[in-house]
Amino acid sequence: LSYTEDSDGQILEEGITESGSMASFIAAGTSYATRGVPMIPFYTFYSMFGFQRTGDLIWQAADIRARGFMMGATAGRTTLLGEGLQHQDGHSLVLASTVPTVQAFDPAFAYEVGAIVRAGIEQMYGPDSPESERDVIYYLTLYNENYPMPALPEDAALAEEFRSGAVRGMYRFAAAPEGPSRRATILFSGVAHSAARKAVEELAEHYDVGAELWSVTNYKRLREQAMATERYNRLHPSAKRETALVTSLLSESTGPITAVTDFMCAVPEQIGRYVPTGRPFKVLGTDGMGRSDTRESLRRHFEVDCGHVVVSTLEGLADLGEVDRSLVADAIARYDIDPDAVDPFLV
């Protein structure tokens, strides 16, 4: 690791010692209270060996009101190719969802990471942040797959919508292509954007379906906001009913909804009951053990590649009666999907 020493910063390269590293994170993350010296630790680690290996220490950090950033590097079940089941993380976001003060983000693009980090620092130490909301830990998944990073839109208002959407949990990344007569919605997180974006092209070209794309950076935050809305409505029966943010945003979209992630299906399913009524909600995730193979083979094995996104979207349209189920069978054949393959969860 190459770095430059500086009098106003510090880097600790601790090696394979997750418990020791968490101790350092806690010390730095609580120094605002114990020493009156605000610090903002960024702890970067193999995402598989964070919440799974040092969960007790992360809970302790939350309990004693630590502030800082945990960076789950080499994230995703299919992204760390060739490393096998001991290193391929498809569930740190599930474990992170159990810690109340952790905000668990799964960004896809560089501008999302930048917006999230800025928002986190402002929440922890910004002058306009309420005291009751300062004691938080931001967990960000970071992948090791290289791909071109899209720029923010040139329109300033739209660029701000992208940034604020990344922080609140989701935003519309791309409108449905013009031309197709049928409509659908695809949600992606992290590296799953590639399968989602390719599926949009395939659906438009071969199946007369225009799918809009939404980037979902934080299912946990969306769920918690929706739960707070439910609680308010329950305890204020005479007040005007409020609508959960995720329900309101998805109401702006059309058609069946497919969510694709490089993590377990349990991550997108956090918002399942808040999807607008009457909209089929399909989830593609990487439940099961990791295995050593290429990214392409792993994504086919876990059924989260482009072909499976297309099939899932068409199934949702068939559920609504908008297409015949023979079209689903056509897509299964087109993308050479084996319908009798063993469930990846069982392998």
Feature annotation, model-predicted:
Residues 34, 74-87, 91, 97, ...:
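Thiamine diphosphate
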Residues 1-15, 37-41, 179-182, 290-291:
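Glycine/charged-rich beta-loop-alpha catalytic/anionic-binding loops adjacent to active sites
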Residues 59-77:
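A glycine-rich helix N-cap at a beta->alpha junction
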